[in-house]
A protein has these predicted regions:
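Membrane-interface helix-loop-helix modules in multi-pass inner-membrane proteins
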Residues: 4-74, 95, 171-182
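...captures the hydrophobic TM-helix bundle architecture rather than a specific catalytic motif
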Residues: 12-17, 37-44, 48, 70-86, ...
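Transmembrane alpha-helical segments of integral membrane proteins
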Residues: 49-56, 196, 227-240
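Long, contiguous internal "core" modules enriched in hydrophobic/ aromatic residues
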Residues: 54-207
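Divalent metal-coordination and catalytic microenvironments
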Residues: 125, 229, 271
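Membrane-interface capping segments at transmembrane-helix boundaries
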Residues: 199-205, 266-282
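Short, membrane-exposed interhelical loops at transmembrane-helix boundaries
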Residues: 234-253
């Protein structure tokens, strides 16, 4: 975790700038429609960052405060990220390229369930990461809770997969119409196969396989989302081409991306390489 923490921060700012520069219409609509959940997500991330840094400087009798701040910051950030994803699936009310919905349009049972579902998904991801990076009693504890978490996540995916086409006919039409059906059909099959492999890996106390298979599950989930919405970047009707910036702006951003991206990837690779292997009691954050 101590290598992933500084390594994942440089990608957030370029990602936001890329959305603003390459798809300004998407940036303006999404930001206006999801202003409150995105702000709360950022507040959670701020709590995480502050707690992570200050815990190691606090006295022993005060560290529990920063532990709780980190836990709640993580939960809030993850929950509202899931809420935003759920609202994205539901779509936005757009007229003449402007958001015309209400401030709380994002607050629905589906989005709240999506927020809870993402907490389960990221909990499993963190659990399997600890299986991969730790040893001893902590690793055994994570092995014990990985299977229940995986089964809960499977139930969440099942509920979302049924709820989405029933509640949103436009998505059902995308799922079950050609050629989208051809692209979408492998996703649920691969999800079930991956879950089976994950449960088998956890049962035999594997170290690395559970985390890798959980990554595959997360990738399949976002792949299903992409297939469900493609080619729209602002559901239900604004396509990626309608929201794109002029070619000159995209060309300018491409030059900057080609320059910056290798540094980010190189730094991330180097961080993971340096901190490869198991974390022991003697290791610490400095």
């Amino acid at each position: 975790f101590h290598c992933a923490w500084p390594a994942n921060r440089p990608g957030r700012r370029p990602a936001g700038a890329a959305l603003f520069g390459a798809f300004p219409l998407a940036y303006s609509v999404v930001l206006e429609a999801l202003y409150l959940p995105l702000i709360l997500m950022l507040v959670g991330l701020i709590f995480r960052g502050v707690a992570f840094e200050f815990r190691f400087k606090a006295r022993a009798n005060k560290r529990h405060i920063w532990d709780k701040a980190f836990i709640w910051g993580s939960l809030v950030a993850t929950f509202f990220q899931g809420v935003a994803l759920g609202a994205f699936i539901e779509g936005f009310k757009v007229v003449d390229r402007k958001f015309v919905g209400g401030t709380l349009d994002w607050l629905t049972p589906f989005t709240l369930f999506s927020g809870l579902g993402l907490i389960v998904a990221y909990s499993l991801l963190g659990c399997t990461w600890l299986i991969m990076k730790t040893e001893g009693s902590l690793q055994k504890q994570m092995h014990d809770i990985a299977r229940p978490l995986a089964l809960v996540l499977l139930a969440v995916i099942g509920v979302v997969s049924l709820w989405t086409p029933i509640a949103y006919p436009q998505i059902a039409e995308r799922w079950f119409s050609m050629p989208n059906l051809v692209w979408f059909m492998p996703v649920p099959i691969l999800v079930l196969v991956t879950f089976y492999g994950l449960l088998r890996a956890v049962a035999r106390d594997a170290h690395y396989t559970p985390f890798l298979l959980t990554l595959v599950l997360i990738f399949l989930g976002y792949s299903g989302l992409g297939i469900s919405l493609w080619p729209n970047i602002i559901p239900p009707s604004i396509s990626i081409w309608d929201a794109a910036a002029p070619p000159q702006s995209q060309g300018f951003m491409l030059v900057g991306t080609l320059f910056i991206l290798p540094f980010i990837l190189g730094y991330t690779y180097w961080s993971y390489y340096v901190f490869r292997g198991k974390v022991t009691h003697e290791d610490g954050y400095h």
